[in-house]
Curated annotation (Swiss-Prot):
One of its GO terms (molecular function) is aspartic-type endopeptidase activity. It comes from the Bacteria. This is Lipoprotein signal peptidase. The gene is lspA. PROSITE patterns: SPASE_II (PS00855). Its main location: membrane. The active site is at D120, D138.
Amino acid sequence: MNKYFLAGIISVVTLVLDQVTKIAVREKMVLWTSETVIPGFFNLVHVVNKGAAFGFLNRADITWQRNFFVVVTIIALGAIGMLLKSAEEKDKFQILGLGFVLGGAIGNLIDRILYHQVTDFLDFYYGSHHYPAFNVADIAICLGAFAMIVSFYKNK
């Protein structure tokens, strides 16, 4: 299978899953609310984040972070394109990884452009210790980064 086709399929599926789940959360849940799914472990929440992963730069007193993250994401998309172009057809881990990162990056970019913030809704916790809420795009970016690390060590 052609590397561009494979990465494209992965990124489109990722993007669709990300946007469909975020739309459902925005339409079905009131902002800043929570619904318990697995008591003591997992909630669905409706929160927004103007910053990056784990709430980095998610502050109301600064307004430039949206434009900053839009520019950084566009630069990253260019880098992903260059990495995909240079990837060998047989390096499926790298190609899959780039597809996941591409879809996730575009998913969060759409939120930043349309809503000036990213919708997060997956809340895992133990007791009172909550992991920062995240979304499908974040999962895809992490999976993609992991696949690219595997590719790097596999080809070393």
